[in-house]
Amino acid sequence: MISSNDFRTGTSIVMDGAVWKVVEFLHVKPGKGSAFVRTKLKSVQTGNVVEKTFRAGETVPQANIEKSVMQHTYKDGDQYVFMDMETFEEVSIAPDTLGDKAKFIKEEMEVSVVTWDGTILDVELPTSVVLEIVETDPGVKGDTATGGTKPAILETGAQVMVPLFIAQGERIKVDTRDGSYLGRDNA
């Protein structure tokens, strides 16, 4: 149990049988009446955001969320198979749990898997990944003057917009949060 006075951004609580993460909180002490805590909560499962007010000192169950580092080993049909880096146990994750993140996951990539009571809630990717371009239109000399972009298909099947000077076979950095081109890979 956690007191509403101890809420901080990122605190996870259980409310109505679901896990909620505190996005914003504000302790309010009105001139008349008792103090309260106004919060914005985000559902970890659905992403919905709700506003909820708690009395000061009210206790709610705290969610015991665990994060474990796992490595994507292979894809079995449409299931993504990850291996826990400490216990070496394998876990299959459905594409609907991954959502849009699935298009940036490649083999041997390390991710953080968030679980609650044995249920996988989320898979957190690194903020950027290096992927190879497998298909794009060829660049023509002098194309950079216009500053335009063209579509490129990556090794994972994702499609991103890249500058005109980028060629097929190059390795680029991609932001996993929005799928935007960040630059060429220097390694």
Swiss-Prot record:
Q: One GO cellular component from the entry?
A: cytoplasm
Q: Which Pfam families match?
A: EFP, EFP_N, Elong-fact-P_C
A Gene Ontology annotation in the biological process aspect, one of them, is: peptide biosynthetic process
Against InterPro entries, the record matches this protein to: Elong-fact-P_C (IPR015365), NA-bd_OB-fold (IPR012340), Rib_uL2_dom2 (IPR014722), Transl_elong_fac_P/YeiP (IPR020599), Transl_elong_KOW-like (IPR013185), Transl_elong_P/YeiP_cen (IPR001059), Transl_elong_P/YeiP_CS (IPR013852), Transl_elongation_fac_P (IPR011768)
- Which keywords does this chain's UniProt record carry? Cytoplasm, Elongation factor, Protein biosynthesis
- Enumerate the subcellular locations listed in this protein's record, separating them with semicolons: Cytoplasm
The answer to whether keyword Protein biosynthesis applies is yes
Q: What is its main location?
A: cytoplasm
The pathway is: Protein biosynthesis; polypeptide chain elongation
Instruction: Identify a single GO molecular function assigned to this protein.
Output: translation elongation factor activity
Report the function annotation for this chain: Involved in peptide bond synthesis. Stimulates efficient translation and peptide-bond synthesis on native or reconstituted 70S ribosomes in vitro. Probably functions indirectly by altering the affinity of the ribosome for aminoacyl-tRNA, thus increasing their reactivity as acceptors for peptidyl transferase.
What family does the Swiss-Prot or TrEMBL record give for this protein? Belongs to the elongation factor P family.
**Which PANTHER family does the UniProt entry name for this protein?**
ELONGATION FACTOR P, ELONGATION FACTOR P (EF-P) FAMILY PROTEIN
Could you identify this protein by its name? Answer: Elongation factor P
